[in-house]
Amino acid sequence: MSRVAKAPVNIPAGIEVKINGQLLTVKGKNGELSREIHNAVEVNQDANALTFVPREGVANADAQAGTARALVNAMVIGVTEGFTKKLQLVGVGYRAQMKGNVVALSLGYSHPIEHTLPLGVTGECPSQTEIILKSADKQLIGQVAADIRAYRRPEPYKGKGVRYSDEVVRTKEAKKK
């Protein structure tokens, strides 16, 4: 059995968990998230904990149990606390601003870039060079942050571009004559 799957997922007070076949739904103050659990994993609900047991005779059931436990744990954290991603814009003239649920980016191209945030993700720009994204869905917020970063990834010589706030950009030395 996977080491990750051995640990149960604790359900805090105020969180409602429903298991309908292989569909698991977690409801909390930040919203509701649902996920289809792999058939190789059996989910058991106790009073305030979820346990994940791999089914016998199914290939990679141990790995699937660990994966399911990690994903459900992220769902529980998401509906209780939520997740945030911070992006920084580094470069002369690089700007960001929110227009409703659209992030308007000026990244040195001849045209402005407008990225519409999907349902479940909110954003704010405390300054022109900073974007803060918030969501209950860890995978969705990570994908949205990666999509915004992909418009202008940090380049290795000056470090200009869109980067995560905790990202360390390794810079190269310029070519010498």
Curated annotation (Swiss-Prot):
Gene3D superfamilies: Ribosomal protein L6, alpha-beta domain. It holds the Pfam family Ribosomal_L6. One of its GO terms (biological process) is cytoplasmic translation. GO terms for molecular function: rRNA binding; structural constituent of ribosome. GO terms for cellular component: cytosolic large ribosomal subunit. Keywords: Ribonucleoprotein, Ribosomal protein, RNA-binding, rRNA-binding. Part of the 50S ribosomal subunit. This protein binds to the 23S rRNA, and is important in its secondary structure. It is located near the subunit interface in the base of the L7/L12 stalk, and near the tRNA binding site of the peptidyltransferase center. Belongs to the universal ribosomal protein uL6 family. NCBIfam families: L6_bact. HAMAP family: Ribosomal_uL6_B. This is Large ribosomal subunit protein uL6.
